[in-house]
Amino acid sequence: MNPLETEIGGLRMKNPLMLASGIMGSKVHSLNLIARDAGAVVTKSVGVEEREGYRNPTVVNWKCGLINAVGLASPAAKDFAEELKDYTNEAPLLISLYGHSVEEFSDLVDTFDSALPYLHGYELNLSCPHVKGAGLDIGMDLELSAAIVEELKGKTKNPVFAKLSAMHDYLKLAKVLEDAGVDGITISNTLRGMKIDIMSGKPVLSNLSGGVSGPAIKPIALKCVYDLYKEIEVPIVGCGGITSFEDVLEFIMAGARAVQIGSAVYYSRRIFYSLKESLIAFTRARDCTISDLIGIAHS
């Protein structure tokens, strides 16, 4: 028996370790490398049309993680669908979608459902903190967010997940999305922050501010998962600052059925293998499965 197997919204995974959206870019070769050891792969967020994103610098490394403002740079959906036809399918593939309206999200699902028969689901980006009119701006509109979920659930057989931010009333939004039929909630995306170059006296990022990720946001994301577990029935995916198997276990014990790894991949692409092996050793030593540990912090 595989002690790490888990399921979220009908999506069965060999382990609870998912690649978070964005960190590996939009080239399928990079996604295939991660799929060998990951439980699932979430792509970079993509919209209907190609988006150039912000000019450099777009990422800054600081002592507690990363701050990025890439600006949702991505190929057009149709081009990305062609790229993904070379995906090896060693782990379930989910497409991260961003848009500005119900119609845009609907068009995106039409594109990917028709092009990729082996697709396993979608994750709605309702939380990117640095692109006007998309991401967090959509997530702040409860009625629009619910309408997007209802539209997509009415047209695709694939699971639909939503990625939320800790920077707004995530409990209220999660409940609204649950009522709309969402299959799972991922929390949290990056949180707004910035860094200033003391020599020039100017912000380092070209966009001035960006999204903070890495260990600095882990306690915040962990509390979000803990809170949501008490309030919603749909599966929760924890995301934010996970760098060790102990971090993974904390999120699982708080109530997550799976976790996403992002910034840690920046430092080591072997992070999934390392975490997987450590989790296997932990569960075997205690004669338990990952599923046995879900939510035990509430006991």
From Swiss-Prot:
UniProt cross-references to InterPro entries, sorted A to Z: Aldolase_TIM, DHO_dehydrogenase, DHOD_1B, Dihydroorotate_DH_1, Dihydroorotate_DH_1_2, Dihydroorotate_DH_cat, Dihydroorotate_DH_CS, Dihydroorotate_DH_I
Job description of the protein: Catalyzes the conversion of dihydroorotate to orotate with NAD(+) as electron acceptor.
Protein name: Dihydroorotate dehydrogenase B (NAD(+)), catalytic subunit
Domain of life per record: Archaea
Keywords, sorted A to Z: Cytoplasm, Flavoprotein, FMN, NAD, Oxidoreductase, Pyrimidine biosynthesis
Pathway assigned in UniProt: Pyrimidine metabolism; UMP biosynthesis via de novo pathway; orotate from (S)-dihydroorotate (NAD(+) route): step 1/1
Lineage of the species this protein comes from: Archaea, Methanobacteriati, Methanobacteriota, Archaeoglobi, Archaeoglobales
Catalytic activity: (S)-dihydroorotate + NAD(+) = orotate + NADH + H(+)
A GO molecular-function annotation: dihydroorotate dehydrogenase (NAD+) activity
Cofactors (names): FMN
